[in-house]
Structures are given as structure tokens and as C-alpha cells.
Amino acid sequence: MNRLEDKVALVTGAASGIGAACARRFTDEGARVAGLDMVVPDAHPCAAFATADVRDAAAVRAAVEGLVAEVGPIDVLVNAAGVSSFGTADTIDDAEWARVLDINLKGTWHVARVVVRGMVDRGGGSIVNLASVEGIEGGQSQAAYNAAKGGVVLLTRSMAVDYGPHNVRVNCLCPGMIDTPMTAPLQDGNLKPVLEWFRDQHLLGRVGKPEEVAAAALFLASDDASFVTGHALAVDGGYLAGRRFPGTL
């Protein structure tokens, strides 16, 4: 079943990771996908692709307007562009704090505010933002990342309140640890114990796949979720449900 037949979907962060998985899945489900990222990947399924730094509001607006001219008005937006960061509140410097907040939170806002007006004018649409379990439950030594992703959750709910009367649904996904280029540095060296700890905290005993997050994004983007808005959906293998003691049944 093509759940996004005749829909136009804009996916940010579409060059890799969760964004790329969303672009592939949405294309498979019948959407014309417009990709947006810092670089154009060598291979992608998108009907059109543009480059922009989501921190640059003018560049975002120009890129989105160009994509709309090429593929048509946007029915679905997936804000998947993002970066990770480690550091406590007293050790992270101003530049890194700004980088993480500007990409993860301000970048989400930059794209959403351009796209949502067209959705309102056309009578509806669906926005899916990428937050994180760390936007719900603060993680150790991730002060900027936690703040940014928590902001994405509340930006999502704020937009759901404001645009619900216009039939624009706004939801977010809160993934756990997902096997992407962003988490690849955790697979080697002194950060590997962090990856192993996260894996063990997932009740399903493994890290997630980008395709699993894309499947959840598809649900929220499609009419299958036609009565869902303002929701933060965990795709976390049970991470937020609770903790288990080692060696117990």
C-alpha cells in the first residue's frame, strides 16, 4: 500500500542516517521526496535535492522555495537534520553550545516556519520533527544536546496547538540509540562503553536501525495517524519504559 501516494515530502538531513532512511521509505510509499542537507549524496532516491545549512534562515528559505518550484507544494515535512555533542554545563564552550542548539533546535524551527505557512494555506499537512529520548530524560554529559532536543519536543507541541485548527498535524519522534553515522564514533575507542551501556538499557537488548525510525515517521506522516498531533513518539526499544537489573529475568 502506498501510504504517501501523490504527496510531496521534504526531508532534511536526507544525505545519511535517519533522514536518508526516511527519504527511501517515503519514496517507496509513493511520495515525491525533496531532500535537503549540507551536501548532495552520491546516490539518493529523491526527486529533487538542495543544499543548505539549516542554521542559515535565508538559505533555508531559498532552498525550500526552489524545491517547491521543482516538485510542488509540500504536504509532509520530516526535520531530521541534527548533530550530537558531549559535555556538561560547565565544560561545554559557547561555540559548541551555539552549534548544537542552532542546528538541532533553531534549524528545525527555520525549516518548519517556512513550510507550515504553505500547509495552512492549502488546508493541511503533517510535520514530523526528530527529537530524542534525551529530550524526555536528560542524559549524562549531553547538556547542549538534551536542551536542544527537549526544545524540539516543546516546539512540536507548541506548533500542534497553533496549527491544529488549520489541519496541520505536528508530532515528533524520540529515538533511542540508533546505528547511524552520528553514533558511529561510539563504536570504537574509549566511548565504546557508552554504546554498550545504551544497548543494555534498551529492553530489546540492541540498538535501533534507521529504517525502524523511518517506519515510525511514515506512520506519523501518513493518514494512518490522522487523529494524532502534539505527540512525542518514542522509538527506543523500551529505553524510557524502565531499567532492568543485570542478570534478572
Task: State the predicted function of each range.
Residues A112, A148, T156:
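Active-site helix of classical SDR
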Residues C172, K192-D224, V228, V235-G237:
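C-terminal helical subdomain
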Residues D90, E137-A143, P165-H166, G205, ...:
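Active-site loop immediately N-terminal to the catalytic Tyr-X3-Lys motif
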